[in-house]
C-alpha cells in the first residue's frame, strides 16, 4: 500500500495517500527508517495529501521513549506482565537521547489542523541520502545518509541536536557480543576540547541553540510552547558534556 507514494528510484505519480484514503497523512521518520522508506515527496492533491518529515540525529527508539518513559511509571504494568525490561544494550558511547519527540508534538498538531480545518501541514526537506547498492552499516540498508563535517546527517528537519550537535549520532546500537539493537540509536559525545573548539563557550552555544529552535518554530516543525524546553535540554546537554 505504501508504494502508491513511495518509490526507491524516485519515479512515478501517486494515486492515493498512504493508506489509499483521501485523508491527510504525515509520515514522521527517524534515521532508523528514512533510508528504507524512499518517500517520493509531498503532495497536495485531492486524493493524496501527504507530508514526509524526516528527523536527523534520531532513531526509532531512544532513551526517553524506550527507557525513561517507562521508569516514570507509564506502561510498567504491561512490561511486568510480559516479564520484560527495556534497556539500552550498547557498550560504547551513550544511548541516543536527542529530544526529537518535540517534532512529533508539532506533527500531531499540524495533522489535526490539516484534517479538521483544511490547513496544509508545513513542508520539510528530506534527509540527504545516496544509494550505495551495498550495505553501509550492520543494519544492511543499501543507502547512506550524507553527513556534515561533524559526522551527522544533512538535511531533514533542523533542530539544535542537528544544527549544533554535541555528539555524533547513529541510528542503531552494537552490543558487545556483536549483536544489534537495530532501532535504538547511539550517541558518541564530543570531548570537551572539541566542544570548546567548535562553540567557544556555553553562552555562544545557547545563542546557536536558540537560533536553531526559532527557525524550527518559524517553519512549523516545533511548537512555540516547546521552544524554551528544547533550548534548555540542548544547553544542559552541552554543559554536561564539558562545554
Q: Language model features by range: what are they?
A:
Residues 1-5:
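Short, small-residue-biased leader/transition segments that mark boundaries at the very start
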Residues 9-12, 18-23, 28-31, 41-51, ...:
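Alpha/beta-hydrolase-fold serine-hydrolase catalytic core, especially in secreted/extracellular enzymes
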Residues 34-38:
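Conserved alpha/beta-hydrolase "acid-adjacent" motif
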Amino acid at each position: 500500500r505504501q508504494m502508491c507514494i513511495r518509490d526507491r528510484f524516485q519515479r512515478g505519480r501517486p494515486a492515493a495517500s498512504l493508506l489509499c484514503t483521501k485523508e491527510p497523512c504525515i509520515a514522521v521518520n527517524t534515521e532508523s527508517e528514512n533510508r528504507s522508506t524512499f518517500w517520493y515527496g509531498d503532495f497536495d492533491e485531492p486524493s493524496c495529501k501527504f507530508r514526509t518529515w524526516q528527523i536527523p540525529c534520531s532513531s526509532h527508539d531512544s532513551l526517553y521513549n524506550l527507557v525513561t518513559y517507562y521508569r516514570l511509571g507509564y506502561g510498567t504494568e504491561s512490561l511486568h506482565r510480559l516479564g520484560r525490561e527495556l534497556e539500552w544494550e550498547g557498550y560504547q558511547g551513550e544511548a541516543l537521547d536527542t529530544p526529537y519527540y518535540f517534532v512529533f508534538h508539532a506533527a500531531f498538531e499540524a495533522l489535526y489542523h490539516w484534517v479538521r480545518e483544511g490547513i496544509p501541514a508545513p513542508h520539510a526537506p528530506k534527509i540527504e541520502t545516496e544509494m550505495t547498492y551495498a550495505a553501509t552499516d550492520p543494519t544492511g540498508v543499501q543507502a547512506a545518509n550524507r553527513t556534515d563535517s561533524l559526522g551527522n546527517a544533512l538535511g531533514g528537519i533542523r533542530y539544535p541536536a542537528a544544527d549544533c550537535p554535541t555528539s555524533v549520532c547513529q541510528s542503531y546500537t552494537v552490543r558487545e557480543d556483536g549483536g544489534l539493537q537495530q532501532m535504538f540509536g547511539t550517541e558518541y559525545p564530543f570531548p570537551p576540547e572539541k566542544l570548546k573548539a567548535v562553540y567557544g563557550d556555553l553562552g555562544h552555544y545557547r545563542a546557536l541553540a536558540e537560533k536553531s529552535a526559532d527557525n524550527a518554530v518559524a517553519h512549523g516543525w516545533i511548537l512555540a510552547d516547546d521552544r524554551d524546553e528544547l533550548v534548555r535540554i540542548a544547553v544542559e546537554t552541552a554543559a554536561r558534556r564539558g562545554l
